[in-house]
Every structure is written in structure tokens, then in C-alpha cells.
Amino acid sequence: MLSIAVFVSGSGTNLQALIDYEKSHTSCPYRISLVVSDRKDAYALERAKKAGIATELVSAYAVLGKEKAEAASRDEKRLAVSNAALAACKKHKADAIVLAGWLTVLCGPIIGEYRGKIINLHPALLPKFGGEGMWGRHVHEAVIAAREKESGCTVHFVDSGCDTGAILVQKKVSVMPDDTPETLYDRIAPVEHEAIVEGALILARRLHENEG
């Protein structure tokens, strides 16, 4: 059984998909042992508590304190959050990490210590529309502006780059001529739920095979 930590910044609908799959499948190869958030108001933390899953808040303010957080650079905050997240994963003995709507770019030792054991969900068909600044609504706006005929989501391994790791799962949807960022998001969200579960299952089975 693979113990996973799920990192979430928002409402946690993809986290809920992972929770629901685990609870409804006795043969599920993963167990969510921890939910980590970099936002104190993330509803994902409530979802975790309702499911009896341990939570850790690793926002820059929580980690550094108000004064230091406000004075820190973007890279300093990213490293502080990443290091706190790594400590949380070690504390709860997480074998792997699933980024399910996580906004802070991870950096530092966590990338090396969990190499090949971190996957991320991205709301576009990588390698298109990835990299710095490409998250949430920004991605959907860019897809529509580029007049793409299709979009979707990608689950990929995390490396030291931004949205550059090897791809595990992709799900496609059509982009309609009258789409807005909101309508496109609504069409992609259900396939994100499918993709994140598929990605977690693939990760769990691969790591189990490697151990065997």
C-alpha cells in the first residue's frame, strides 16, 4: 500500500476524487495519509478533516511568520514552503506526492528526495500552455486566445523544471467557438478528476513493481 501526500491550494475537488476512489475500492493501491496546503483558507483542508486525513498548512506566512514572509523574495518563499512540505511528508511517512491543484512551484531538496515519486495535474495538454504563470484561469484564457480546437489536462512527473516532467496521463476535450474560461474549465474539470485518479494508480503500481 502506497502512502501518499496530496498537495492542494484550492477547493480540493480533485482531492475529493482521490478520496472517493480510495473509499470505494477495497483494492485501491494507495492510501492518502496527508493533505498539505499552502493556503489557510483552502476548502481542501476541510475535505481532508471530514475524511479523517491529517493536514498540514505550509503557507509562507505559516512557515516564516508575517514579517519575514512579507520581506522574502518569491524564490525564498518557494523554498521555505517546499522545505516545510518535505518535513510534513517525512513526519507522516508519505511514500509519494500527488499535486492536485497546487500553486507553489516546488524546489530544493524535496525534488531530489522524492524524484520519480511526485506527480502533478496541469489543466492543459502539455507541452502546450505550461510553465511559469500558466495555472487555472490563465491557462484557459491562453487556450481560447490561441484558438485551439482542443484542450484538456495532463498528469506528469515533477522534475526541477516547471511542467516539464514525463507525461503519465492526458485527457482531451473540445474547445467550442463560444467558450469562456469558465465554460472551458467546467468541461475540463470532470476529466481532471479521472486523470488524477489514473495518475495516482499508475504511480502506485509502478512504485510497487520497482520495490518488488
Identify the function of each model-found stretch.
Residues 1-212:
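One-carbon transfer enzymes
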